[in-house]
C-alpha cells in the first residue's frame, strides 16, 4: 500500500505482486538497486538560473510492463458481494473483528445497493515510486505464504476458495478473511492484524475528498438522499445513498440536464483549510531521512508551481500501453515536445532530447503503408467487378430498347391498316344508303306502323279491362242515377270545348287541298285503328265516357266520340249556347266527309309514339 502527504506524489491503492507473506517489510534506499538515472527534462524553464530541477526516481514501484491499459481512475466497488459472503460464513468472534474495526465496520452497516456502487472511496493511480522519506510513501512487500505453497501466484478466486475450505475459526482463517476482503480494494498489511486497525485505510482519501454528487447541490438534490437511521459518528458514506431508479444507473444525459450551467460547488470549510495547511506544510524532520528526489519535487511543484515531465519514462510507458494488432510488435509514440525552448529574458536555447523510438515510428509508417496498399488493391478488385456488371447491364438494356422499338413500330402499322378498312366500310355503307334511300324510308315507315298497331291494341285491351272494373264498381253503387246526371253535365262541357278546338283545327287544315291530300294518304294506314276506336266508344255506356277521355289524354279523336254519344242519347249540345248548332253541323260534315275523320288518327298515333318514347 502506498500513500503520501506530498501533493506531487500520487496515491496508490494496489500492489502488483499477489503473493502472501507473514511479515511486512519496508523497503529502504539501500535495498533499491542503484541504477544510472536517465536524463531529466522539465516542461517549464525558470526565469533565473536558481530554478530547482526535479530528479528522476531511481525505481518505479510498478514497472511499465505491469500495465497495458491507459491511465484510469476506477469508481465502482462491489461491496455487497464480499460483505454478504463474510456475514454468512464467519463466526461471531471473527465477524466481531470487522464490526469493531475503526474503518471496516462502516462497510457492514452502510446501505448495500447492487446497482449503484460506492464511488470515490479511494483513488487508484498506476504510477508510484519508492522513497525513503517518512510521510511520503508507505508500501509493503510480501513473501510466499506456506498456506498456498512456495512460489504460488495467488489470484482472487484462489483466496475465496481457500476461505471456504477453512471450516474452523482460527487466526489463520481470519487472515485469509482479511485478505479476501481487501483483494478487491487494498492489497496490503494482512499478516499484522493490529497494524490493520491502526493503519489509516483511506481516511484522508475519502473523508477529505468530495464526490460530484456531494459537492454539487443540484446533483445531490436530484440523485441522492439521506439515510435517517445512520449513526452520527459514521462518515458520509453511511449517511447517504443514491435514489432508487428503474435502471441500473443514471444516464449521463439526465445528469447533464440536471446540471445545466451550474458552476457552484461547496467551498472549503475551516477544517479543510487546516487540513490542507497541515498536509502542505514542511515536515519537522524528526526521525526522518532527507530525500533529494522528494524534496526537489515538492519545491518545484509547490513552491515554484511548475510542472515535471520525464520524457523517457513517458515514452516507455506509452510503448507498453499501445495496442497490439495482428500479433505485431508494440509501437512507440513520442511525447509532444518542441524542438527547442527559449528561456525567458535570456534568449538561451536548449537542444531537445533525441527520442529512442525512431525505429518504432518507422515500423508504424511501414505498417500503415502496407495496410493502405492492401486496402487499395481490394478496392480496385471490387471496382473492376462492378464495371463488368455494369457493362452487362448496359447490353441488356440496349437489347430491351431495340425490342420495344420493334414492337411499337409493328403496332403502329396495324393501327393504320385497321383505320383504312374502317373508313372504306363506312364509305360503302353511305353509298348504299344513298342508292336505296327510298326503300329504307319505306321499310322504316312500315316498321313504325306495325309498332303503332301493337301499341294501340295493348292500350285498347288495358282500357277495356279498366272500364269493366269501373263498371262493376259503379253498378254496386245506389246513387247511379245522380252520378249519371253529373257525368252528362261534365260531358256536355267537354264536348263544347272540344268542338271549338276541332273547328279551329279544321280551319287550319282547309288552307290548302294539296296538303290535305298528303295527310289523307299518310293517314290511310291509321284508318282501321280510328274505326276500331270509334266502335269501341259507341258500344260503351254513357257512364264510361269520362274515363275514355282521361285515358286518351284529351286527343283530337275524343270530341267526335263524345259528340256521337250525346246525339245517341238524345241530348242536344246546342242547348243553352248559340254557337253550338254551328259546331254540330261542322261535326256532322266531318263525320260524313272522310278527310277530317282520317286525319285524327294520325295525330293520335304521333302522340302515342311520343308518350311511349318518354316512358
Curated annotation (Swiss-Prot):
Residues 424-433 have a biased composition (Acidic residues). Keywords: Phosphoprotein. Residues 424-615 are annotated as: Disordered. The modification Phosphoserine is found at residue 48. Pfam families: DUF287. Residues 579-589, 606-615 have a biased composition (Basic residues). Residues 439-476, 484-496, 504-521, 529-561 have a biased composition (Basic and acidic residues). This is Uncharacterized protein At3g43530.
